[in-house]
Design a protein with these regions (language model features):
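C-terminal capping alpha-helices of c-type cytochrome domains
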Residues: 93, 97, 114-155
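Gly/Gly-Pro-rich "capping" loops immediately C-terminal to redox-active cysteine motifs
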Residues: 43, 52, 66-104, 108-126
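Sequence context surrounding c-type heme c attachment/ligation sites in exported
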Residues: 47-62, 72-77, 127, 136-144
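The canonical Cys-X-X-Cys-His
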Residues: 49, 57-68, 95, 149-153
């Protein structure tokens, strides 16, 4: 009986540890900018990823990238590469890293870091007359939203 209780506790704690998202400050990029582990600890939802990619208040990926599967969304951009067939030459780990912080893969990229909270250049007083806030910012996307976008791109 005790063994069953202990086993159940181990399973509960192990499940909780897996489900805890990796915070932006804990993200580990490899030497090429890829992130090996899921940021949320859960699989992504491709349907929600498509919504995030077209939502102007969230990812808005189509503002810079053309995506044939999302043709219903207006105003596809041409700043970034087309995302059609990207799963043919990028892994989920590479896509996760690029979405989290593209500058870890492409140093001069103009793509925003969607899962970064610190390390930004803040001009402050010199340009606005107001001191720049020093606290961390909120990431543009959550860990699960990044996994959702990766799931969509891998379809």
């Amino acid at each position: 009986m005790k063994l069953t209780g202990i086993s159940a506790a181990v399973v509960i704690f192990a499940t909780a540890a897996i489900a805890n998202p990796i915070t932006p400050g804990e993200v580990q990029f490899d030497e090429y900018g890829a992130i090996q582990a899921s940021l949320s600890g859960s699989d992504g939802d491709a349907a929600n990823g498509a919504k995030i990619m077209t939502n102007r208040g969230k990812g808005n990926c189509v503002a810079c990238h053309a995506v044939t599967a999302l043709n219903d969304a207006p105003f596809h951009g041409e700043v970034g590469p087309t995302l059609d067939g990207i799963a043919d030459y990028r892994s989920a780990e590479e896509l996760r890293g690029i979405i989290a912080n593209a500058k870890m893969t492409f140093e001069g990229s103009v793509m925003p870091a969607f899962y970064k909270t610190s390390g930004f250049i803040r001009p402050g007083d010199g340009y606005t007359g107001k001191g720049a806030k020093e606290e961390d910012l909120t990431p543009i996307l959550t860990a699960q939203e990044i996994e959702d976008v990766v799931a969509f791109l891998m379809t």
